[in-house]
């Protein structure tokens, strides 16, 4: 493996009703099974929320980089990610899917779609996921 630019290690104990924390103690999160999946409705986070948070931040940063490299660095995109757990017919379990909603300003719809496509090709999360999960991207301009 090439020498990493950055690395982090997160440890999980207790599965979906447990906790996750970083080895350097800068991150800690209690977890709970969502009510929709048989949980007790506790307001703790879950793996899908953490995935959506990471993906939305990473994609937004990739898009900001693409915009800045094209002298549009003053535009502040908004990216939301909805994570889905879907039935997996292959093994009877579940699989992950994601929908990205990207909003840009001060450009045409066609320009926005071009920038979002470039960001999708640049974003580390997208690179890791686009061949393994279903990803839908919606682009809008305000």
From Swiss-Prot:
Transmembrane segments: none
Top-rank lineage group of the source organism: Bacteria
Pfam families: OsmC (PF02566)
InterPro entries: KH_dom-like_a/b, OHR, OsmC/Ohr_fam, OsmC/Ohrsf
GO biological process: response to oxidative stress
Recorded family membership: Belongs to the OsmC/Ohr family.
NCBIfam families from the UniProt entry: organ_hyd_perox (TIGR03561)
Protein name in the entry: Organic hydroperoxide resistance protein-like 2
């Amino acid at each position: 493996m090439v020498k990493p630019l950055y690395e982090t290690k997160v440890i999980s104990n207790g599965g979906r009703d447990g906790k996750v924390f970083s080895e350097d103690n800068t991150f800690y999160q209690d977890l709970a099974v969502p009510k929709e999946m048989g949980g007790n409705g506790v307001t703790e986070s879950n793996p899908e929320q953490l995935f959506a948070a990471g993906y939305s931040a990473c994609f937004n940063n990739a898009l900001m980089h693409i915009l800045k490299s094209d002298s549009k660095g003053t535009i502040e995109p908004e990216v939301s990610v909805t994570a889905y757990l879907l039935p997996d017919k292959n093994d009877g379990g579940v699989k992950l899917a994601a929908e990205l909603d990207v909003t840009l300003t001060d450009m045409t719809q066609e320009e926005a779609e071009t920038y979002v496509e470039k960001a999708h090709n640049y974003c580390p999360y997208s690179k890791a996921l686009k061949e393994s999960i279903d990803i839908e991207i919606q682009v809008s301009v305000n």
